[in-house]
Amino acid sequence: MELELEPITLPGVEDKRPMVIAGPCSAETEEQVMSTAKQLADKGLKLFRAGIWKPRTKPGGFEGVGVDGLAWLKEVKKETGMYVSTEVATAKHVYECLKAGIDLLWVGARTTANPFAVQEIADALKGVDIPVPVSYTHLR
């Protein structure tokens, strides 16, 4: 099986390397997200990311702000003109992001370790034209 990779292309974003996608690992408050986005936009960055759902090894830990954070990303897009992105781990995450108009999704390293989760996400994205980078961390 040969893997076909396509470059990520977004209108108004130069195809140069490296492509910088920046923002908080975890979106914790609207103020944090907006402040970070405005600072990055002022530096000329075009791609903003924020973790909305945070998978945890230990149950009971902070699992992210969830769907509420998607409204913050919509506001980032509206106020700065940046493209917005977040990590997805389930089909429900995909559907919520698509409803919110998120521009780019990514599949994190933890999720890639579960082929059932990857297939669920792929099924949710059928017929959708949205960039979906896949993280991969090789652990020794």
Name the predicted role of every residue range:
Residues E30-Q39, A89-V94:
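Short, acidic/polar
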Residues E63-S85, A124-D129:
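Alpha-helix-loop-beta-strand connector modules within alpha/beta enzyme cores
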Residues G44, L98-W106, A124-P131:
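Glycine-enriched alpha-helix->loop->beta-strand junction motifs that scaffold or abut catalytic
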